Amino acid sequence: MTFHRSQNLREVATKHCYQIQGPDAVRGVGGWDTHVNQGSTSGQLANNLANLGEGLVAYAQALGEEWNNTTVVVLSEFGRTFRENGSRGTDHGHGTVYWVLGGNVRGGRIVGEQVAVNPQSLLQNRDYPVLNNYRNLLGGLLGRTWGLSASQLQNVFPGARPDALQLL
């Protein structure tokens, strides 16, 4: 399921609270391929971030008290280049960020491995490096949230070293 507006996440929250029993779900949000005219404080990227933020707020509000039992992870399968391309956008890159939200998340901080952004740390002088493997993060969060064993997590994320980064 792909979302483009906060109303969609509000509807999902309603279904989550009243129809779904047990752990749920992977949801997608499209429209993030910003090769052309990405913008910064205005434009495609700013609009997408605003819509995502509004959707997440609507989702949390619609869940009400159930938000305290909910963990949301926002991630992308790839990052974007640190440097702008010739079309005023960014191309597919390597490193990215993950957002972890929820009523039981110890947030309000940046966690995981980090490096200063400088020419020496960028791959091909344009890409932020992959420092935090999504398999490790998701494995750690799923293990803590759903009580999955190390062997169960290895079936889903072979070779991963689950680490919830002290977020839960």
Where are these regions (language model features)?
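Ligand-binding pockets and gating/stacking loops
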Residues: 1-168
